[in-house]
Amino acid sequence: MKKLMMLKMQGLKKTIAKFAKKIEKMDPGSGKFGEFMDVVLDEMKGIAFDDVTRDGAGNIVGTVKGYGSGDAVVMISHVDVMPGSRHELEGLNARGMARFKYGVIANLYSAALIKRTLLPLTGDLVVCCVPRFECCDPGVKYLFDNFLKNRTNKIKGVVLCEPTGFNVNIGHKGRMEYEIVVKGKLKKNFLENRGMNMLGTMFPLISELEKVSKDLPNNVNMGRSGLRIKDVLYRGYNARDDMNEFRVVVDRIFVPDESEGAILTKAKTIARKVYSSESEITVRTMLSKERLKTHTGLEMVSEKEFKPWIMESHKPFAVESLKCLTENGFKSNFGFWRSIVTEGSYTCADLKIPTIGFGAGEEDDIYSGEEKFSLDKIERAVYGQSLIVQRNIGMPTFGWTSDSI
């Protein structure tokens, strides 16, 4: 099988290089997101998927049909959705977004390689390219609630086409944005509608949160949790009930040992303690929400959260995936992402589907600003992802496993 795959890989190199050149300088930001996804859709239609579609949320899905009715493997790559104002402010362009394009290219062409080998699969290979917002990932939820709704229990595993340095990654930290809402009669040294005075009232809470940020849990594989004050909002004074309200918006990174509920409860406890001397105070904590609109026009309201997740390394999908890589020249190990988030926050944390990550490039490359693609890395990612698919759902032929062919 290795020789067959390598032979077919040679035949794909020029096509991969052509597609890489086409999208290398494309910028999905500044209102051109739909144009970028159109190019991805057209490419998938041109490389012999058995079925290609785009759903209501803008997810592009291609299927390579298996010869049997066994469990499927789902491969997911993403494209970052960046609002125009943020995009221009931070100067993000094709350079800064290059590494997610590695995942898109390898995702499509690993399926193309599988098709060209003609090696049978026991179940379908489903290739998905999903839009991902900075604050949340509603696209992948829409995908599983709709296109994959009747197949969730028939998925052997999910492969996330993300930068792993060709390791098999099995988890990462979570990230969420939450609000602490304090409302009450802040009589002590407080004059309503005075900006400096309002900041002075909020400072004790901000100060306590800063103290907490210095003593957060650390995970030996994923790194330390984090806390950052994102915004402070004064919602004004209501003369009818003599109440003032302000909100502190917190950006929180958290390891799997922490829970969303415990984090929100602790934040509420801190705020109540800070304002314990004030009368008639109420404190609420909640996940922030954002109204989003996809390039297809679908509007959604989503909580601003990516959940942490870890998949046990002894799970067969993880074990077999790592084994097939090391048997075929990859110096792979199990690993974890330390700073990025992925669709595993939904597929593994919520749906409990075995999920791994594998791809070209290092995690830190996302922020490096490199302009040029490495075609060699892309080709290795295509080869490696194809090996993972074959090992997990390749159909034995004439008494041999697909690895023996």
What kind of region is each of these model predictions?
Residues 1-4, 25, 29-32, 179-405:
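Metal-dependent amide/peptide-bond hydrolase catalytic core
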Residues 78-81, 163-166, 173-175, 235, ...:
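Short glycine-enriched loops at secondary-structure junctions
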